[in-house]
UniProtKB/Swiss-Prot annotation:
CDD domains found in the cross-reference section: AdoMet_MTases
Subunit structure, as described in the record: Homodimer.
GO MF annotation list: carboxyl- or carbamoyltransferase activity; S-adenosyl-L-methionine binding
InterPro entries on file: CmoA, Methyltransf_25, SAM-dependent_MTases_sf
Gene that encodes the chain: cmoA
Taxonomy of the source species: Bacteria, Pseudomonadati, Campylobacterota, Epsilonproteobacteria, Campylobacterales
Native species: Helicobacter acinonychis (strain Sheeba)
Protein name as annotated: Carboxy-S-adenosyl-L-methionine synthase
Keywords carried by this UniProt record: S-adenosyl-L-methionine, Transferase
SUPFAM superfamilies the UniProt entry points to: S-adenosyl-L-methionine-dependent methyltransferases (SSF53335)
């Protein structure tokens, strides 16, 4: 269904409620440049990494899995026996995910706050456009928990909206991104209303800050797999 959520001002902070879940797939496709390409790229690197896994049934977590799009891609790309656990604290989102993946018996979803649970040892984690919504003081805690739960040679995918450390470049990047959204059919008002709703909810870091954060929790190998203006996909490997 087409995203018309911000035709008018919400009058409240953005949250992942039933109204958002109803249009979320369209919102993702029209708001994140090269969204599907990043999903496929991330799935490829996880699939390649799993070839080195000694676990007969590797476990993969998707934290903030929303409507389950990444698991749809993973199930298509990975041929070996795997277990997928998607975690999100929005039940409306998970209902969409469960419907999409109901035929995949290897895929399970949990409606919990992933900041408050312990993870099993896993071969891979994904945080796709999620870290930016977590309070800055909690990001390092979460990433350290993920690092400690990753098996040796396991990987973490991080997709993020980012900012430039240069004020002028950051302004230009934002302007280009708004032009992109206009070309996707969003009006000036919709862009402005969404920006207002996301203020202090979505807090982006720079590319350098995100890489430094990953390195600070123990990752020695962090690479940018993809970057378009103010969006990036990172992979970090535990060695």
């Amino acid at each position: 269904m087409k995203d018309t959520l911000f035709n008018e001002a919400l009058g409240k902070r953005f949250c992942f409620d039933e109204r958002v879940a109803h249009v979320f797939d369209d919102m993702l496709e029209r708001s994140i440049p090269y969204y599907h390409e990043m999903l496929n790229l991330g799935a490829y690197f996880i699939a390649q990494n799993l070839k080195e896994s000694i676990n007969p049934k590797p476990l993969i977590y998707d934290l903030g899995c929303s409507t389950g799009n990444f698991f749809v891609v993973l199930n298509k790309q990975i041929q070996q026996d795997i277990e997928l656990i998607g975690i999100d604290n929005s039940m409306p989102m998970l209902k969409k995910a469960q419907e999409k993946l109901k035929d995949f018996k290897n895929t399970h979803f949990e409606c919990v706050d992933f900041l408050e649970i312990d993870f099993k040892e896993a071969s891979a984690f994904s945080l796709l456009f999620v870290l930016q919504f977590i309070r800055p003081m909690q990001r390092e805690v979460l990433l350290k928990k993920i690092y400690n739960s990753l098996a040796l040679n396991g990987v973490l995918l991080v997709g993020e909206k980012i900012m430039s450390e240069d004020r002028i470049l950051d302004k230009q990047m934002i302007e280009l991104y708004y032009l992109y959204k206009q070309n996707q059919g969003y009006s000036h008002n919709e862009i402005a209303f969404k920006r207002e709703a996301l203020e202090n909810v979505l807090v982006p870091y720079s590319l350098k800050e995100n890489i430094a954060l990953l390195e600070s929790v123990g990752f020695k190998h962090v690479e940018a797999l993809f970057k378009w203006v103010n969006f990036t996909l990172l992979v970090a490997r535990k060695t």
